[in-house]
């Protein structure tokens, strides 16, 4: 092909010699250098879309979209048709071909799944683009600098917010108290990277739900009093049932120094229907801490379900008095507890339940099953699975757990518990 100065079709970037990797369904733009071109023909692997932009001022931008799945059914001509996108440019008797190679990464892109109508499950709750057709949907990238999320929170949110986050070099941050008054869903976009969220002050639930998936939640700055003394509270839930769910799914909660959730213990504040933590690693670096702290909450009847499943809760050194969930005496409840709680398939390393792992007023059921508890033998404390502080008849299942370590006893229930199961005895055999 003759080389002439007024005819060119090429990719403007100089770093396109390697294969360009896409997530399933992802779209990327490539700027072309085009001179003297009269006609073009584009070929792409089966399932891929490649076309020039119709947006004004971007006529020389090639828009490439990967198929929604990684299945490859290639039938096209033009060299290696399983990876090549080729542009044949012509001008009279002259012709030129520009090519790039593309492939789909072997990873999940939750944003692409959402765009293509797939269900995303977070703590048993399904989200998709039909349920959230009116949401404010954002893709945010912390590759080059910290990204502030403050503008996505307010006490008067008119629509749900879904944030797909990517980039691990820097943090996503919030400063000051953040109010949640509609559904807020925060998802690490790619399943093979976990972005970091670092709040400076607490988040206040008002209405809706709060869902996390595939996020590292760094709580290092929440180690003070007042608004830095916990991560999430219910200080804005002023009507029964306004805030339905807090779900943390497939996350890392790092450097826990204060409660993850805290009930503000006011008669005018209501509870959260469902709290779920699953498939999550939790790094605890504090003694005598309740991860979910109902404190002296009044409206206990609003807490319906608590699910704590498939988590790893750990510390480098034994932490005394760690609680998974706690309600403290001191206020007379306005409604009795009806909580159904499941603590299943977890691993606890150096977490000592000397203040009782699960401590509540009344409940309908409690399952603590198929967990592993391992504490360094030098820890001189007893450890207790549960205590109900008022008389009730919940269904109790505290079976198939394995315990190691401690110089003192592992016990099913605290001696002050008004529910005592199993009736055959309180001591748990160590392994």
Q: Which residues does each PLM region occupy?
A:
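Acidic, glycine- and Ser/Thr-rich low-complexity intrinsically disordered tracts
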Residues: 115-120, 130, 390-431
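Extracellular beta-strand-rich solenoid/capping regions of secreted or surface-exposed proteins
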Residues: 68-69, 158, 171-186, 194-243
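Acidic Gly/Asp/Thr-rich repetitive segments characteristic of extracellular carbohydrate-active
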Residues: 110-166, 171
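Solvent-exposed, low-complexity, repeat-rich "mucin-like" stalks and linkers
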Residues: 3-47
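A short beta-strand micro-motif common to beta-rich folds, especially ectodomain repeats
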Residues: 1, 72-93
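Right-handed parallel beta-helix
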Residues: 183-185, 208-219, 242-255, 270-288, ...
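Low-complexity "stalk/linker" and mucin-like segments enriched in Ser/Thr/Pro/Ala/Gly
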Residues: 41-67
């Amino acid at each position: 092909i003759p080389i002439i100065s007024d005819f060119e079709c090429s990719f403007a970037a100089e770093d396109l010699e390697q294969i360009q990797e896409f997530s399933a369904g992802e779209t990327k733009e490539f700027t072309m250098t085009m001179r003297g071109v009269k006609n073009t023909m584009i070929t792409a692997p089966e399932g891929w879309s490649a076309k020039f932009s119709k947006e004004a001022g971007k006529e020389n931008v090639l828009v490439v979209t990967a198929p929604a799945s990684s299945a490859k059914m290639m039938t096209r001509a033009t060299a290696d048709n399983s990876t090549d996108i080729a542009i044949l440019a012509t001008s009279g008797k002259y012709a030129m071909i520009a090519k790039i190679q593309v492939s789909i990464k072997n990873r999940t892109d939750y944003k692409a799944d959402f765009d293509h109508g797939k269900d995303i499950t977070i703590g048993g709750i399904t989200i998709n683009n039909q349920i959230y057709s009116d949401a404010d949907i954002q893709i945010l990238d912390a590759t080059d600098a910290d990204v502030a999320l403050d503008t996505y929170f307010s006490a008067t949110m008119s629509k749900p917010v879904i944030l797909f986050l990517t980039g691990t070099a820097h943090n996503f941050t919030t400063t000051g108290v953040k109010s949640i008054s509609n559904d807020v869903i925060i998802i690490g976009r790619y399943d093979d990277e976990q972005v970091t969220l670092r709040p400076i002050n607490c988040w206040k639930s008002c209405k809706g739900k709060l869902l996390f998936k595939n996020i590292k939640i760094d709580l290092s700055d929440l180690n003070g009093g007042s608004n830095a003394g916990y991560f999430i509270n219910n200080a804005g839930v002023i009507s029964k049932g306004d805030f339905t769910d807090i779900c943390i799914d497939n996350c890392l909660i790092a450097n826990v120094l204060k409660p993850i959730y805290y009930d503000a213990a006011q008669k005018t504040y209501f509870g959260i229907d469902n709290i779920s933590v699953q498939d999550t690693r939790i790094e605890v670096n504090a003694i005598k801490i309740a991860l979910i702290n109902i404190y002296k909450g009044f409206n206990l009847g609003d807490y319906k379900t608590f699910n704590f499943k498939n988590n790893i809760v750990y510390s480098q050194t034994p932490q005394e008095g760690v609680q998974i969930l706690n309600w403290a005496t001191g206020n007379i409840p306005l409604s009795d507890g009806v909580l159904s709680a499941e603590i299943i398939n977890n691993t606890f390393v150096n977490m000592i339940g000397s203040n009782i792992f699960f401590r509540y007023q009344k409940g309908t059921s409690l399952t603590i099953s198929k967990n592993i508890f391992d504490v360094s033998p030098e820890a001189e404390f007893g450890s207790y699975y549960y205590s109900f502080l008022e008389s009730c008849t919940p269904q109790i299942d505290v079976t198939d757990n394995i315990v190691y370590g401690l110089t003192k006893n592992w016990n099913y229930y605290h001696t002050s518990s008004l529910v005592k199961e199993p009736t055959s005895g309180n001591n748990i055999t160590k392994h």
